[in-house]
Amino acid sequence: MNAHPKTAALTDTIYAKPPSSETAHRLVAAANSLLQHFETGKPIDAKTLRTTMEDAFSASDTNGAWVWKDAYDAVEIAQIMMIARYGALMRKQAASPAQFLSMVERLSALAPSHTRRSEDSVRLQQFSTPLPLAAIVAEAAGFRATDLVLEPSAGTGMLAVFGQIAGAVIALNELAEVRRGVLRSLFANALVSGHDAASIDDRLIRAITPSVIVMNPPFSAAQHVDGKFRKATSQHVLSALARLAPAGRLVVITGESFAPKTKSHESTFRSIGEVADVVFSAAIAGKVFARHGTSIDTRLTVIDKRSAGEDVALTDA
């Protein structure tokens, strides 16, 4: 469908950005339309995405009603809907975790690349977790139906949805108001909060003591701080670890330098070592995020919190 006739009819009007709740509603509506493409295995190109967004917002991006970051969020929401609807069946049909990952990769390949970035996404480092990497995080987390899963920097819930299909109870925290609205729509039974995840342990209600935390926090950005804030990752991880239940597991995606032997993070890992053990850490090439608007090298780290009274594990430095 050619969008020009509709766009021409709208160019005389400059549209104000819809209220957050309305934007969330329209993003979910766009995602529902895009879901049909994923269900039938059809790739989503820029033309299809633009038309879908114009239909959902009754306006073009040139009028200011939506930006391309919104469009990419709609695609991501549709992917989450796919996993919520079909993920459990996909897992059942897969003969191995590798085969399940292959299914997820084929689904991910249908989505367009993030070729345009908004000022907010850059400032707040809102670079979404690629769907295949989210599946790997889920495998590392080992979700069970008995778990209470917290995603402190939830975005649209790309990590948490894998806990949901495992039958776990879900708690989601997201600072951005529009994304919180999306989360409430996608995860009807989840507790959704809007705190600064850098101090999640101080802010979240005490009744939530997660057995698993999965997170992809900003690498070097913080609320109310201009420019880079190099302690951002440490603050997010340490606060999440403080909230994690004894014997719980934390799986985190960070910048590549977040490692025990990096001088700037030595004190953070000493603090981690007082209550938990790093059981896995591996660097991830930046090309994994390339389709999502950034090529920064990252790291996947798995941290197991010790049970109350458990001795510190002795490991080689």
Positions of the model-derived regions?
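Short, structured coil segments at secondary-structure junctions
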Residues: 166, 186-188, 274
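C-terminal lobe and adjacent flexible extensions of AdoMet/dcAdoMet transferase-like proteins
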Residues: 303-307, 317
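Replication-associated primase and helicase/ATPase modules
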Residues: 1-9
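Conserved Class I SAM-dependent methyltransferase catalytic core
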Residues: 137, 175-177, 227-302
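Conserved beta-strand segments of alpha/beta enzyme cores
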Residues: 169, 189-193, 277-280
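Class I S-adenosyl-L-methionine
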Residues: 11-184
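Conserved proline-anchored active-site loop of SAM-dependent methyltransferases
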Residues: 134-165, 172-173, 194-227, 239-259, ...
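A conditional alpha-helix N-cap/helix-loop micro-motif detector
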Residues: 130, 194, 230-234
